[in-house]
């Protein structure tokens, strides 16, 4: 609320009307993103749908990401079979290929020493498997070139090239599926020509929720 003079003679002060959600814990997901300047940037917390593995639950960790939060399947002691986060977006007509940048927390390979993996797929197509921390260790060939810089930056960014299937309404669903525990997703950027490298991985794109 702004004022020009301090002697406004208001007949009454009125509190703006407040609308409360009856079950706020259920008011999650269902985000649909619009492209902005050649890319779609999404905070991991703003998923369209989350599927849990048996005895697990997708958990939002506030402030873990550089810009908002992180999403992790917990507890880490359980298997990740069947778990997934899906992100719904619209892409412009004529886009046939995208570069998907997935930003995760710099988790060490505590469960699988060969590295922790996740799958990336678009519209149910063939998934691409990403091993994001196989070289995140103190071996002589990695400690100065990979380990120390990654520990300092606290994130791991990986890129995946995907074909874009035809869509009648331009809507597409990107799915991230953890194959190992301990993966914390922070941000996803779907680039079709407009991405510019930045510390915050671009501003989040416009979105609305399907209720």
Regions found by a protein language model. Give the residues of each.
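Extracytoplasmic
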Residues: 1-211
């Amino acid at each position: 609320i702004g004022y020009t003079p301090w002697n406004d003679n208001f007949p009454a002060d009125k509190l703006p009307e407040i609308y409360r959600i009856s079950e706020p814990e259920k008011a999650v997901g269902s985000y649909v993103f619009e492209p902005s300047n050649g890319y779609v940037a999404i905070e991991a917390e703003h998923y369209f749908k989350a599927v849990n593995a048996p005895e697990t639950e997708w958990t939002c960790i506030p402030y873990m990401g550089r810009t908002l939060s992180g999403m992790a399947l917990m507890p880490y002691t359980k298997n990740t079979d069947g778990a997934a986060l899906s992100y719904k977006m619209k892409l412009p007509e004529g886009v046939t290929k995208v570069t998907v940048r997935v930003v995760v927390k710099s988790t060490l390979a505590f469960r699988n020493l060969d590295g922790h993996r996740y799958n990336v797929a678009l519209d149910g197509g063939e998934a691409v498997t990403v091993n994001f921390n196989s070289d995140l260790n103190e071996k002589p060939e990695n400690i100065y070139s990979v380990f120390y810089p990654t520990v300092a930056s606290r994130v791991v960014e990986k890129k995946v090239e995907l074909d874009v299937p035809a869509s009648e309404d331009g809507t597409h669903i990107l799915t991230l599926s953890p194959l190992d525990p301990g993966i914390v997703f922070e941000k996803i950027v779907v680039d079709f020509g407009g991405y510019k490298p930045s510390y915050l991985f671009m501003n989040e794109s416009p979105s609305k929720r399907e209720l």
